[in-house]
Amino acid sequence: MQDVTIIGGGPAGLFASFYAGLRGMSVRIIDVQDKLGGKMQIYPEKIIWDIGGVAPKPCNEIIKDMINQGLHFNPKVNLNERVTDIRKIAERHFEVETDSGQIYESKAVIFAVGGGIINPKPLQIKDAERYRLTNLHYVVQSFSKFKGKDILISGGGNTALDWARDLANIANSITLVYRKSDIKGYEAMISVLKALNVNLLPKTQIKELIGDNKCECIKEVKLENIETGEVTTQAFDDVIVSHGFDHENPLLKDCTSKLDLYDEYRVKGFGNTTTNIPGIFACGDIVHHDAKVHLIASAFSDAGNAANLAKTYINPDAYKEGYVSSHNDVFKESNKKVINQYI
């Protein structure tokens, strides 16, 4: 039996893993995705500015640092597993069941699933999925992949606009299509895109994807003007779709241990990561309380609280907080390696 099962491998879950290890607890992380990092994996090229004391850097670089830190104390990690139930058997005895049929036991549970299971909304046209492994994209993993190419972006939200801006000086051409006549609230961004020579096509949607002879790659796209019905055909090297995300969090509704909810997707918290069930703690975007700030930085604070409270739940005689890292002997050997990098 582990001391703590952490459900979710994003910023909150990874720092909870680190801090629980710092407090001497054994940890298991379970995540439905095939890699750690949570929602941040959707925006790997985005520059993150708002983590205190961390210089602006691409999201994927921050993910690497968070994963290295989260795995420092060697937690068990189970990826590609969806948690389907949490059962409190007794005080300091929980069962966490996954869709693999496995049941993992622990003395406490930390809920750190962010916004839940997030999947990009697929392009709703015939045979679109056949191109997903080639040149139909729902996530921009690397800007360099699109260098010198003719790109079509479909979507009118901030992500689509950001991708159009960021790729404008990398790609050969950018065409942005969106269903509305204008994009309210983004007037300044539209001006930027025009200055970057992005081809803006309002009231336009993708009607058909035309593949090559082997139907492995998109070669042309039929675009339809929603207002006039006019259809034009243009050649593109890649198509990027940004139509938002589907959020799933069936665990909150279906699990045996019923957590009080703020809405359908978030746990009602009390400001210190405790929930209505002793032994289950919630941190990061999944928890809501009146003082909540939805930032990566605040997820770290939540995670530290959750780990500390899990420690005292398991062992009421334990110190309420751990020693700070600068004075903690647990890092004695690791510090030598770090110091050598600066000599």
UniProtKB/Swiss-Prot annotation:
Q: Where does FAD bind?
A: D31, K39, Y43, V83, I118, D285, S326
Per its record, the protein catalyses:
2 reduced [2Fe-2S]-[ferredoxin] + NADP(+) + H(+) = 2 oxidized [2Fe-2S]-[ferredoxin] + NADPH
Cite the entry's keywords alphabetically.
FAD, Flavoprotein, NADP, Oxidoreductase
Give the EC number(s) under which this enzyme is classified: 1.18.1.2
Q: Which cofactor does it need?
A: FAD
One Gene Ontology term of the molecular function aspect? ferredoxin-NADP+ reductase activity
Instruction: Specify whether Flavoprotein is a keyword of the entry.
Output: yes
Origin superkingdom: Bacteria
Q: How is the cofactor bound?
A: Binds 1 FAD per subunit.
Q: Name one Pfam family in it.
A: Pyr_redox_2
Q: How does it assemble?
A: Homodimer.
Tell me which family the UniProt entry assigns to this protein: Belongs to the ferredoxin--NADP reductase type 2 family.
Question: Which HAMAP family does the record cross-reference, listed alphabetically?
Answer: FENR2
Record protein name field: Ferredoxin--NADP reductase
